[in-house]
Amino acid sequence: MTSKKEIEDALKIVKNKFYDPKLKTRFANYTKNIQFTFNDLNTTYLIKIRNGDLESLKEESIDSPDIQVIIESRIMIDILNKKINPMKAYTTGKLKAKGKLTDLLKLQKLL
C-alpha cells in the first residue's frame, strides 16, 4: 500500500510543473480548485490555482471543487511517473473525474 508520504512526494511533481514556462502560458488567467481524493489513504488534497499560479497544494477538502478526481494513490503515482497514461486510467475506470470537459483536458497537462 502506498503511504501518505509517497503521495505527497508524488504531488510535488504537479507542484513543480507550475514553474514550467509552457505550462504557465497554458494556464494563464486560469483559476480553479482541483480536488484529489485517495480513497485507499482516506485523504483528500486540494490544489488551488489562481490566475495560472499555484496558490496552494495541501491536505484539504471543499464541498464544490471545479474538478473532482477520485483515484487510488498507486495509480496516481504511476500516472505522475509516466507508467500509465491518464486517459487510459480514466477510460478503464481507475481514475474518476468530474468537472467541465475543458477543465478535464487542462488537468491532463498537469498529470
Residue ranges and their predicted role:
Residues M1-L111:
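Feature captures hydrophobic
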